[in-house]
Regions:
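Beta-strand/loop substructures that line and gate deep hydrophobic ligand-binding cavities in soluble
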Residues: 116-142
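Well-ordered alpha/beta subsegment
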Residues: 139-171
């Protein structure tokens, strides 16, 4: 994938951005590239929405996450507004141990839990994105919460890497 193609895909998704150099893309068989966004991390992969969503579910399970809730945004918009909308799914996910620890430190943490992972159709493929848990939990104070957020964030990064690499996954 050429640098200009990457820039066009990102611009289509959210305005101007810069993609990593093309030689880094040659190493990835899935034609994926990852970037940070203001409040999360994301990767574009050359898979349709349903296959990308299946890969994410698999990767979440592999990394110990529980899917607490799921919202099919495309269907919701179609059903409630009568507007055709491309595939867009929001998953509410948590690491049970981390959630328990956070709630023991601050019962009101439930206001920002679970963490969100999204999968949506974009430019002949899909985007997989996850919230930056450190940024999400920054509104709460406490050194112990920062460590819980750091661990959760690292595991979400692993989920995105695993889902975009196709390692150990068959649709």
């Amino acid at each position: 994938m050429q640098d200009r193609e990457c820039e066009e895909i990102i611009e289509t998704a959210e305005g101007p951005s810069v993609c990593a150099p093309s030689e880094q893309h040659a190493e990835r068989e899935t034609s994926a590239f990852q970037e940070e966004c203001a409040y999360g991390m994301k990767v574009w992969i050359r898979l349709p929405h349903d296959e990308a969503l299946a890969a994410v579910r698999h990767a979440l399970g592999e990394r110990g996450f529980t899917i607490a809730c799921e919202m099919d945004v495309g269907r919701l918009i179609r059903d409630k507004l009568g507007i055709t909308y491309p595939g867009y799914t929001i998953l509410g996910v948590s690491l049970p141990d981390a959630m328990h620890q956070a709630l023991e430190l601050d019962r009101d943490m439930g206001l920002i839990l679970p963490h969100h992972v999204i999968v949506y159709e974009q430019s002949a493929g899909s985007v997989i994105a996850a919230v930056d848990v450190i940024a999400e939990m920054a509104i709460a104070d406490g050194r112990d919460l920062r460590e819980i957020a750091r661990v959760s964030n690292e595991k979400l990064r692993e989920v995105i890497n695993l889902a975009s690499s196709g390692v150990g996954f068959e649709a």
